[in-house]
Amino acid sequence: MAAQRDDEAGWSAEAARRVWGGAVPLQVHLHDADVTTLPPPPPFLTLGPRIGYLPLLVPIIKAHFSSTLPPGIDTVWFEYKGLPLKWYIPIGVLYDLLCADPERPWNLTVHFRGYPSEILTLCDGEDSVKWSYMNSLKEAAFIITGNSKNVMNMSQADQGALWQSVMKGNLDGYMNISTRLKLGPFEEDCLVRTSSVEGQQGSDEPESPGSGKPCRVPVRLYVRSVQEDLYDLEDALPVGDWESISYINRPFEVRREEGRSYITLEHALKTLLPEFFSSKASRIPDDSETAPQAPDSAPNDDSDVTPRSCEKLESSASSSPQEANVANKGKIVKLVRVQGIEVDMDIPFLWVANNLKNPECYLHICVYVGTRKREPKDGR
C-alpha cells in the first residue's frame, strides 16, 4: 500500500511538472493598422505558457515591434481570426477552445490601438492579471473550504511570491506557498473522516479537503458548438463571437455512491452539465450548483467571496463519451479537452482535478458539441 501511494505521488508530481511546463508555440503578427514603416515587421515567435496569460507577454512582444508602432498610449489586445481574445482566460484554455484542430504555431494578431471595450473588459497589464488571478484563487478557496479567509489572510510578501511563481512557471516556489492554503488534494474518501468537523464549527480556520465535509471541486467549463455535419475537426468553422461559447462556473460535489469504485470524468460531466446530458429541456440549479463570480466581475481584493447563481447557458447541448449520440437533445459530443489532452471519459475525475488543474485551483474543461441532423417526420 505504501509503495502504491509512493507511485501515485510520483505520477502526480510528474503530471504537475508537465502542466506547468506546457506551452503553446505562438506566431504573433502586428495588425496592419499599427504598422508605420515599410517593409512591415516580421511576426514574433514565442512560447506562451499554458498556465499563463496573454497580457504577460506584451513586454517582449512590444520590444519586437517597437520600431514600427504609432505614437500614443498603448491599449494592447489580441485576436484570433477576428475574435478578440479574453485576457483573463489562460493561454492553454484559449488554444484548446478556439483551435479545434491544433494549429502550430498558433497565429495571433496583436493590436496596440482600438481596444474593443464593448467586448473585452479593460486590462491594465500585469496588475489586472494578478487581480484576476487572486480573485479566482479566492473563489476556488470558497468553493473548497467554505470561505476564502485562507487566501485573504496571506501576507503581502506571500501573495507577491505566489504570483511571481505563477508568472515565472516556478512550480517549486508555488508549492512552498500554496500548500499552506489547504486547497487540496481531493480524495475519494473525503466523506469518511468527520472527527474534525465539530471542532471546526464556529471557527474561521479553513477546512481542507478530506476533513469531513463533501469535497467541492472548482470547475470552469467552456462549451463550444460546431457544425452538425463536422467529421474532421480541421473543418470546424472559427468562433465568430463569444456569445456562441457557453462559459460556466459550476463546482462539482464529490458524493460517494453505492457500488461505484470511483467517479469518472463522464459521471462528473453529466452532473456538471445537466443541460447537456439530461433529457429534460431545462433545469434550475439547486444550492449545490451555485457558482462564484466570473473573472471579469470578481469581488474586490478586500472582500470575501460569496457564491451566486450559475450563469444561464446561452444554448443547450448534451454530453457523453467522445463522439457519442445524446438522446432527445439533437447533440453529439465531438471532443473533451483538458490541458491540451483529449481525455478518456472513463478516467477518474479526481485524478484529473488534482493533477490537471491550473494554479488558481480551477479545473478548466473544453467541450465541443455538434448539432445532430434531425430525421424528417413521416419520411419526408
Curated annotation (Swiss-Prot):
Family matches, as InterPro entries: Atg5, ATG5_HBR, Atg5_HR, ATG5_UblA, Atg5_UblA_dom_sf, ATG5_UblB
Keywords from the UniProt entry: Autophagy, Cytoplasm, Isopeptide bond, Protein transport, Transport, Ubl conjugation
A Pfam family it matches: ATG5_HBR
Source organism superkingdom: Eukaryota
Region of interest: Disordered: 194-214, 283-309
GO biological process assignments: aggrephagy; autophagosome assembly; cellular response to nitrogen starvation; defense response to fungus; leaf senescence; mitophagy; piecemeal microautophagy of the nucleus; protein transport
Crosslink feature (Glycyl lysine isopeptide (Lys-Gly) (interchain with G-Cter in ATG12)) location: K138
CC annotations in GO: Atg12-Atg5-Atg16 complex; autophagosome; phagophore; phagophore assembly site membrane
PTM note: Conjugated to ATG12; which is essential for autophagy.
Polar residues bias: start-end ranges: 194-203
Gene3D superfamilies noted in UniProt: 3.10.20.620, Autophagy protein Apg5, helix rich domain, Phosphatidylinositol 3-kinase Catalytic Subunit, Chain A, domain 1
Keyword Protein transport: yes
Localization per record: Cytoplasm
Predominant place of localization: cytoplasm
UniProt entry tagged with the keyword Repeat: no
Entry function: Required for autophagy. Conjugation to ATG12 is essential for plant nutrient recycling.
Subunit structure, interactors included: Conjugated to ATG12.
Similarity section: Belongs to the ATG5 family.
Family matches, as PANTHER family: AUTOPHAGY PROTEIN 5
Name this protein carries in UniProt: Autophagy protein 5
Source organism of this protein record: Oryza sativa subsp. japonica
